[in-house]
Amino acid sequence: MRSECPECSNDLLDMVYDYESVRWKWDAEFAKRPFNMWRYRELLPVRDISNRVTMGEGGTSLFRAHNVGMMLGLRHLYVKDERQSPTGSFKDRQASLAISVLREMGVTEAVLASTGNVAISYSAYSTHAGIKLWAFLPSMVPGEKMREIALYGTEVIKVTGTYDQAKQVARDFVVSRGLHYDRGFKSIAARESMKTLGFEVAEQLADLLGPSEKAPLQVPDWYFQAVSGGMGAVGVWKAFLEMKEMGLVDRLPKLASIQVSGCAPMVNSFHRGLEVAEPVLNPQTLVSTISTGNPGAAYPYLRSVVLEHGGAFVKVADEEAFRAMHVMAKMDGISMEPASAVAFAGLFKMVSQGQIQPDDVIIVNCSGHTFPVEKFLLGDDWERSVEVAGESGTAPELHEEGLLASLENLDQRTNRIAIMEDNLDSARLLRRVLQAQGEYQIDEAHDGREGLEMVRKNPPDLILLDLMMPEVDGFGVIDALKADERLQDIPVIVVTAQELTTSEKRRLDGQVHRLLQKGTFLSTDIMEDIDDILS
């Protein structure tokens, strides 16, 4: 495969296909094939399918993040779950196609530089294909990932320096040994592989939401991805361009490229109006897998996409990414690596800034799994030990008095919170937020009359109150609380779906400590208010 144009020597080449022929095959043959990335083989740069190196990559699920969507006020928030890939990251798509091309070219030994996930994927697939691999890794890559790479038999070279410095050392090694070097973003196979993610999303959305008005497949309004070198976002964008060329979709999405603040050359350069990215020479981030200081040719391409079609370049702090990790795991059961969480943190930020509309269809690439969990993400108090063995090694007898005393002590140190909410989904969400963030005794009522009876029987430390309820609404509940000496000092957080008038806000004065708009707060926002009130 050529590495540069024979006429102009440009080393950023692109693939063009017979789209008319592929369009016919898409209708006639693609649907009969297994749902994986090789379903779209006519749009991939492998001439002979027998050279394919596959381990079941692609065909990952697309599902709705129901709880987080409710929390953010988004009706159509979907997660593309690339954690299901053979090595746990979307880079398996890249490895499968790139190693297939190497096999077709007769390459038996190759070199790459990586911040972690690419090296893991390439190590697995090169071993599967019988190709020897050398991986040059910057020293910031966690030791766990380096050991996993070595487990596959890859020669691991740890470079004391940045990722860009590791790439230079790798290139020097290639020159001295005459080996094949994976060119990253400039590799045709690497970029083309990421198209398959976009193809799958369009098919899956059509199944979930129905086809577009003028085309058989469906397009999201926004596609979110954490970017380092930008290859994934570029590949997905090309997928939508090709589908539009073939009449499979009738519009294009907006791309949201999210980076960490400590290494955000694309975001910084875009907001400064630069046409070429200004490199970050010394990345300062714990999210090492997306610490490319110099994104090269990907930035001008993505910049032109955003300027022409809309979209965003957004940066988030490491802490915002770790916060998003906790929110996604505790609210929707989705555990992910920090790099994936960067994309979700970017979504949270854009929602809070009013850039995303409630009816927008959102796809977030959950690009990889977090296993093992990095120690710094949980801190020191993530577990509690319980001794159950007696002197002889058997379990001690539990006396009723001791057990009751323990339960009483538990009640004494656990705050009681009452939820009054008639919408069952909203009540479930509030309960889930509380359960995920701390130890609380939770009482729940679904109308104002029932709620007042509940708090009179067991006065809580705090009330989470919806205003629009049957029987007695939230305003009536507030009036009743104020009139009862036992209840008038209980703090209240009002969670409402509508904007309140000035007179309505006056009715809430005194007892209400905070007013939260449904769909505009994160779980951590409400927990900060709860912690402040209870402390």
What are these regions (language model features)?
Residues E421:
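Conserved acidic carboxylate
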Residues E444-E453, G474:
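Helix N-cap/capping motif at the beta->alpha junctions
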Residues R428-A436, R506:
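Charged docking surfaces used in two-component/phosphorelay signaling
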Residues V495-T496, K518:
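Hydrophobic/aromatic residues positioned on beta-strands within the core alpha/beta folds
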